[in-house]
Amino acid sequence: MALSVTPSVNAGISLHWGEHRIWCDVLHNRQVPGLSTLTPERFQSLLAHPAFQDPELLFFTHCHPDHYSKTQTRLVQQHWPGAFLALPERQEAVQILLQGEQFHLRLGEDLSIQFRRLPHEGKRYAAVPHYGALLEREGFRVLLAGDCAIGAPELADFVAGTAVDLAVLPFPWVTLPKGRAFVEEVIRPRRLLVHHLPLPEDDLYGYRPATEAALSKVQVPEVWLMDRAFQEIIVA
């Protein structure tokens, strides 16, 4: 069961899992101060990178412009027209519209994806359609939480009774005590992959050193930090 995870920038990742290649929040072109985005130069590098070839599914947790670019997504679908598109707002005539509390998708015979509507971090974003996902293949489960509010009871309900083998979470889940407690006591993953960090040149607020300092405080058997663009991590 081969699984590798490769980031683009910001929250974007590509999961290469057996014959499947899933992109989550990979394509975006709006920079938020203190974070990074997929500039035209980085976008061209991504299109040429081995980890970002022939995606099967383009999944976007939500449609904020630092997570989703319609222009880049259309270019990718022109390049790989077989890629499915799944996101929680109607953006294209042909897409998988994530709606309702939960939504299930199966890819091939061996990959199951359970999507769950989760609250976005921050009260002003409470109405934003936002979905996390649990992916399962050969009994191995991967949690993608997106920009879920830290400690959200909806996320606790989503993972209740589930053995999470890998959790992919933004860095505040490690830097904030509330986030660490939720990871250790509720999600309880066997492995933790921390992402959504800015590149060094964009780190206006010291997110990178704060996250590095906090890694040793989270009690998870294996922890990885995704802090470079196109940094491949072999999970299993």
Model-found features: residue ranges?
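Zn-dependent metallo-beta-lactamase
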Residues: M1-W23, L27-V32, S36-E41, S112, ...
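Active-site-proximal beta-strand elements of phosphoester/diester hydrolases
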Residues: S4-P7, I22-D25, S112-P119, R141-D147, ...
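Pre-active-site segment of Zn-dependent metallo-hydrolases
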Residues: G18-L58, K70-R74, K123, A149-T162
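Active-site neighborhood of phospho(di)ester-bond hydrolases with catalytic His/Asp-centered motifs
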Residues: W23-D25, D54-D66, L85-E89, L143-C148, ...
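Active-site environment of divalent metal-dependent phosphoester hydrolases
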Residues: Q31, C63-K70, Q91-V94, L105, ...
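Active-site HxH/HxHxD metal-binding segment of metal-dependent hydrolases
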Residues: S45-L105
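Binuclear metal-ion centers of metallo-dependent hydrolases, dominated by the metallo-beta-lactamase
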Residues: I96-E109, A127, D157-G161, A181-A236
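Active-site-proximal loop/helix segments of hydrolase catalytic cores
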Residues: H120-V186
